[in-house]
């Protein structure tokens, strides 16, 4: 949804924000396209952090894309210095905890530990 809103009245401002993304039933090549659309629209340039929830039931094509959803996302944001958290328990899968939208969170990602605090 975020990538489709780029350049419209529904576009989001990401400067200083922690962006949360997740998806369900998406093809890997579409995840790649959406990540690079967001990157080219400078949505990652001044992010404070990125939280990746469940990428549930991702699909591949007959000719394999060659990367997992996590690898695609890592590649898209590799040049930036903000913290990135994968497998956050918010998704369309079994683990679907609540995440407040619009809250002033702080995100810390370390080896084996993620802290998201208000």
Locate the predicted segments by residue.
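ATP/pyrophosphate-binding catalytic subdomain of soluble kinases
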Residues: 1-35
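C-terminal active-site/capping subdomain that shapes the small-molecule cofactor and substrate pocket
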Residues: 33-118
